[in-house]
Amino acid sequence: YRCHDWVMSNREEFLTWVRSILWDAEVAIHNGDARPRRAIWSCNDPVTVLGALKNASGQQELDELFAHLAESFSDCTSYEFDLLEAEVLGDAAYTVGFEHTSASVNGVPRTYTLRATQIYRREDDAWKVAHRHGSTPPE
């Protein structure tokens, strides 16, 4: 057993989760289904969103935000997450990257990019999102 091996396997396990379960949840919300995204978010406060459309703090505001997003989004034709950096530190992790999305927003087809930074906690052996900051990149 070497410490480096544990760190690499922990990071690879996290990245596999990001590229599968997290990715699926993002596609779902852009198709109008908030349930998969809500399932990957922590049910323990604090949880926060500094969003491109709206901010949220705490469970009630998070639920309201996700319901609003699900009502706004539909017809996702493309979602790509360009991961710039990710790190796992014990039971915490983060990702930084660009989200490239093509979906309808309030019925109008749009293609846009967001800068996204997310912080995760391991809870009951599962990764959960605790914070998200999404914003449009500078021109």
What residue spans do the PLM features occupy?
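A beta-strand edge to alpha-helix "cap/lid" segment located at domain peripheries
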Residues: 3-36, 46-139
